[in-house]
Amino acid sequence: VDTVVAGNRERDHRTGFTTPPKLTLKSLMSFAAHPKWTLNYLLHEKFKLANVAHFTNKGSSIAKGVMEYINEQYDPAMSWKDAEYCIKRWQGPFALKGLMSVEDAKKAVDIGASAIMLSNHGGRQLDGSRSPFDQLPAIVDAVGGKIEIIVDGGIRRGTHVLKALALGATACSFGKGFLFALGAGGQP
C-alpha cells in the first residue's frame, strides 16, 4: 500500500533526466563542468537498475521508462480487504507502508498487520502530505503498543532517529543514506 501510483517526478521531467544520459547541449555543458564524473562514467561499467532493466527500453528516460514500468505494477484499486487477504495468506510479520492517519493505523491493527510504516517518501512522492513526524504523536496515542510503528521519510541522521523514538516510534527506516553510499560507489 506504499503508494497507489508512481510519483510525479517533476525535477526529472524538468531536467530531462535519462539513463543513460542523452547528449544534449545542456548535458554536454554539464559533462564539461564535471570532468572527473564524466571520465569515471565513460571508463566504468554503466549504471543500470538490474531488477527492472529487462522491462524497459535501452536509453529510455528514467522518468518515462522505468517509472512507467513501476507505475504499471501499482494497483490504484488496492483496498483494506486486499491488505487483509495478503496478511492472512502470508502468515508472518506484515508491515503496511504509507499510512499517515490515525484512522488508517487503527484499521491496520484491526486487520492484523504487525507493523505500519509512516511515510510520505521524504516529501518526494507525496509532497502535499504532512510529514511522518507531524503524524507520529497522534498515531502513537491511538495504536502504540498494539502494532510496531516505523517512521520512514525525513530520517537523515541519528538525531532524527532519537527524536522519532522519543515520540514513540518503534523503529526508523533510512533508505537515502544507503542510496547515497551506493551513488558514491563507496568513495568518500
Stretches found by the model and what they are:
Residues 1-5, 111-132, 161-187:
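Glycine-rich phosphate-binding active-site loops on the catalytic face of alpha/beta enzymes
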